[in-house]
Amino acid sequence: MPSKKVLQTEHINTTDEAPKTTSVRPRKRKADVAIHLQDPDEEVTEMTRKKQCASQACWNPDTGYTSPCRRIPTPDEVEEPVAFGSVGFTQYASESIFITPTRSTPLPALCWASKDEVWNNLLGKDKLYLRDTRVMERHPNLQPKMRAILLDWLMEVCEVYKLHRETFYLGQDYFDRFMATQENVLKTTLQLIGISCLFIAAKMEEIYPPKVHQFAYVTDGACTEDDILSMEIIIMKELNWSLSPLTPVAWLNIYMQMAYLKETAEVLTAQYPQATFVQIAELLDLCILDVRSLEFSYSLLAASALFHFSSLELVIKVSGLKWCDLEECVRWMVPFAMSIREAGSSALKTFKGIAADDMHNIQTHVPYLEWLGKVHSYQLVDIESSQRSPVPTGVLTPPPSSEKPESTIS
């Protein structure tokens, strides 16, 4: 997958495009705690339920009604409501049921929804969007390193086209779940699947998604526009049109928001320092390249990444997780955090045409494959010998969240 086309894309202008302007496009983004509103997953479920109900209402010739004049119910009819008591169903009547979250909610009281209902909806995403931890066994012609190279290249494409971090992680989720539905995928098809997943993700997340020919261009002729459009349909059908997971970076956004939130009224506006968010997001970027990341839920990955930059007490407060939930993932993530530390903190990048308060949300690309190569050279740190509130030795630890730093953490 050559990257020269990716680098050249920044300098390409087509003659039929409108003249560039220096104005900043408003791309104000809200925190993901409002994701339960107009949830696409609920819409897909509702459409499926209606389709099933409609098919059940059709005339069944095997029911014993042989008269051709039998009246067939139509979807437009509205039947009068029937009381339970009048038909003998009083024993099935029950009071309203209130759902209790499986993890304590860190959300503040919300004026527009129940905080428990919102939190339970967020937790439900982790259980709904499952990934196959043994996905590579289904593809004997592929190696885990090929997945890492592909995802690293997709990050590079995202940076060139100024796509959001959420777009990359949606594409990564689509790719992993699609691969779990297939068998014996050839390595020559891998790039087409990856760029098609990113194409779908961009249309789901971006206000101004790139056109299909722009995605085809960065493949350096390996994938045509028709190839991408055809693969798009195949992927969405295999995923059963379930395209709205709560990604690791979305969970990180929620955790960071809860850690730095001062005013409840500002819950939908980012309150945390951008530089801190970028540092932790880079750790997530590096971890997601490793196929073992499939063993952990997205909420757990984000919480473990935050742990390496803060404290156990803070992570418990903002995630509702306990140390017994975090321990395995935190231990696995230690070499990745040490690799990030050795590489040093990356400066917050600026992008022309992107609002200042949205810069941290743009996916960036750094030498992740080089950093990944160093991960395996580190030995796991013995957390128990560290400190009582276990933070692995040698891992970046910023000031306590109570200080609310506004500058870059060194």
Curated annotation (Swiss-Prot):
It is found in: Nucleus. One of its GO terms (biological process) is positive regulation of G1/S transition of mitotic cell cycle. GO terms for molecular function: cyclin-dependent protein serine/threonine kinase regulator activity; kinase activity. The keyword Cell cycle applies. Phosphorylation by CDK2 triggers its release from CDK2 and degradation via the ubiquitin proteasome pathway. PANTHER family: CYCLINS. GO terms for cellular component: cyclin E1-CDK2 complex; cytoplasm; microtubule organizing center; nucleus. SUPFAM superfamilies: Cyclin-like (SSF47954). The keyword Cell cycle applies. It holds the Pfam family Cyclin_N. Essential for the control of the cell cycle at the G1/S (start) transition. InterPro entries: Cyclin (IPR039361), Cyclin-like_dom (IPR013763), Cyclin-like_sf (IPR036915), Cyclin_C-dom (IPR004367), Cyclin_N (IPR006671), Cyclins_cyclin-box (IPR048258). It comes from the Eukaryota. Interacts with CDK2 protein kinase to form a serine/threonine kinase holoenzyme complex. The cyclin subunit imparts substrate specificity to the complex. The modification Phosphothreonine is found at residue 397. SMART domains: CYCLIN, Cyclin_C. This is G1/S-specific cyclin-E1. Belongs to the cyclin family. Cyclin E subfamily. The gene is ccne1. Residues 1-31, 387-410 are annotated as: Disordered. Keywords: Cell cycle, Cell division, Cyclin, Nucleus, Phosphoprotein.
